[in-house]
């Protein structure tokens, strides 16, 4: 039986990659006192991030970017790590969707896939928050780099993004 890993130590700001430093400055400006943590390995998937943090996969607030088909507006869905996003539900909220490739993600958010933070984008996206995240007391979100994350509550996530909370999960 393996031990649950302990949460990695907070990173010094000067040790953070540029995208994570950007997020750290934004969080500080918002009065958010939780430090950014660097994962020992990538957090590109919810399972990898949860394993590195020793938390439940559901606590990973994953950021998935889509492109609104009508006008190329970025659409950010922040979903629980255990949920698959139901694109039909998202489209019902914002209009028809198209896939966002890595170039679009980087251009619109300033971050690479796997490190998209819920805040601090180059172009402000339309954002939706998975209602399942509000059932949890603590979340971890990407902090601008695939190895960087920060801890927050669902209430803080809603306040930081100003996004509506909706049902976006694909249900059986």
Give a label for each model feature:
Residues 2-172:
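Extended, low-hydrophobicity, polar/charged segments
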């Amino acid at each position: 039986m393996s031990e649950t890993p302990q949460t990695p130590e907070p990173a010094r700001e000067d040790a953070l990659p540029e995208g994570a430093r950007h997020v750290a400055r934004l969080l500080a400006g918002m009065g958010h006192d939780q430090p950014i943590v660097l994962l020992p390995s990538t957090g590109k998937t919810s399972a990898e991030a949860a394993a590195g943090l020793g938390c439940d996969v559901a606590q990973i607030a994953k950021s998935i970017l889509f492109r609104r088909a009508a006008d190329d507006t970025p659409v950010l869905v922040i979903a629980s790590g255990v949920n698959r996003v139901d694109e039909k539900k998202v489209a019902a909220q914002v209009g028809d969707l198209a896939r966002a490739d890595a170039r679009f993600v980087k251009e619109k958010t300033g971050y690479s896939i796997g490190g998209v933070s819920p805040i601090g984008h180059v172009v402000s996206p339309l954002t939706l928050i998975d209602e399942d995240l509000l059932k949890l007391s603590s979340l971890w979100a990407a902090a601008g780099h695939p190895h960087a994350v920060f801890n927050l509550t669902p209430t803080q996530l809603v306040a930081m993004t100003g996004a509506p909370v909706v049902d976006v999960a694909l249900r059986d």
